[in-house]
Amino acid sequence: GDPGDPGDPGDPGDPGGSDGPVRIMPLGDSITGSPGCWRAMLWRDLTDAGYTDIDFVGSRAGDGCGFPYDHENEGHGGMLVTNLAASGQLSTWLSATEPDIVLMHFGTNDVWSSRPTQTILDAYSTLVAQMRAHNPSMTVLVAQIIPMDSARSCATCAQGVRDLNAAIPGWAASESTAQSPVVVVDQWTGFDTGSDTYDGVHPNASGDAKIAQNWMAALTPLLD
């Protein structure tokens, strides 16, 4: 809808309609969910910039991040994207929340568990298919995930992230359609595990700010 036209509330019976708020699902693991304060920063940045007709959705309530924000999300600590794809659980969450846009930063635990890159990409494809089954016009923003410090995670983790991220653009191009775009969001470049994480894996405030900025740059053209 047009945020400048308060006289048109839209059809309340059509949550996915063009006049209702844009429903955005943050999807992933603990980097997204616990505490995942990049979501709070992103919400604040979007609303400060005038994008107020938005609704973050998910089955999880978020943690406190120091200021009010729309905290609902699907960031599940410890989750492997390969396990979620196999379980079919995403379909239940989609039915309950009806997102228009998904922000997916997913695969860190898979890399740590030595899942091959192609296996992770196949899981991404399964999730995208489930998303489209619920909303044929779903927009999927897929992160090239933040780096991991092998000294503080697993010996193969740093290279595993590089391998996954190198493969994501080609995968996204093969999955994307005009009706349901799959957009790559680079969360890796410029992210430093030394200064932007507290443990070599999870973002600190500096890392959260970078993640929020990258999502913001990808989201605003979709919301204009």
Annotate each language-model stretch with its function.
Residues 30, 34, 44-49, 93-96, ...:
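Structured segments of extracytoplasmic/periplasmic soluble domains
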Residues 59-82, 177, 184-203:
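Divalent cation-coordinating acidic motifs and surrounding scaffolds
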